[in-house]
Swiss-Prot record:
Keywords: Chaperone, Cytoplasm, Nickel, Nickel insertion. This is Urease accessory protein UreE. It is found in: Cytoplasm. Residues 145-169, 178-196 have a biased composition (Basic and acidic residues). Residues 197-210 have a biased composition (Basic residues). Belongs to the UreE family.
Length: 210
């Protein structure tokens, strides 16, 4: 099986991709994983270190072909505040709980969590359930290339974006025990002015290799 051994960050490649893989947040943090692209190309992701991939990155195959990484839509909560000060206050409470959080211009996005939803509503936030790609902040110790997506990720190991110690465990455990079905038309997605993401269709199947 042909291997993908390097990663090109966002905006670092212009060639047409030979295939693409549709991956959620968890499956975008991998080192070695057998994958099948949306057009059927089978390959082995075989990186030097576990690397946090982002939508728009490219995996480089041994023969030079590229596989585009597409961030799959997943169930999220979009948290909206009344003003900038309120938004900062909400962000502080999420950060205090070590929740992976995506910071938007006027809102915050987290994975769906009914406990946290109740908490932020109690703090006066408006909460909307959406489905969109999840791209949380990498944290203060993330590599600059990971934070901005404009450098080659060939030999950088990245810590995970963060850990939710309330209800989710995002450690580097195997996801071989469950399947992801990403091949829908996404008719039930909520798209608003904050979304800004294209939703690619197709299936990508990933299996862990120890």
């Amino acid at each position: 099986m042909i291997r993908a051994t390097r990663v090109l960050g966002q905006h670092r490649w212009k060639e047409a991709a030979a295939d693409s893989v549709l991956l959620d947040f968890d499956d975008r943090h991998r080192r070695r994983l057998a994958m099948t692209g949306t057009r059927g190309l089978e390959f082995l992701l075989d990186l030097e270190h576990a690397t946090a991939l982002r939508g728009g990155d490219a995996l480089v195959l041994e023969d030079g072909r590229l596989i585009e990484v597409v961030a799959a839509a997943e169930p999220l909560l979009e948290i909206r505040a009344g003003d900038p000060h309120h938004l900062v206050r909400l962000a502080w409470h999420l950060g205090n709980r070590h929740l992976p959080t995506q910071i938007m211009a006027k809102s915050l996005r987290i994975r769906r969590d009914h406990v946290i939803e109740a908490m932020v509503k109690g703090l006066g936030a408006r909460v909307i359930e959406i489905e969109a790609p999840f791209d949380p902040e990498g944290g203060a110790y993330a590599e600059p290339s990971h934070a901005h997506g404009d450098h080659d990720h060939d030999h950088h190991g990245h810590d995970h974006h963060g850990h939710d110690h309330t209800s989710h465990d995002h450690a580097h455990h195997s996801h071989a025990h469950h399947d992801h079905d990403h091949g829908h038309a996404h008719d039930d997605h909520v798209h608003d002015e904050h979304c800004g993401h294209d939703h690619h269709h197709g299936h990508s199947h990933a299996h862990d290799h120890k």
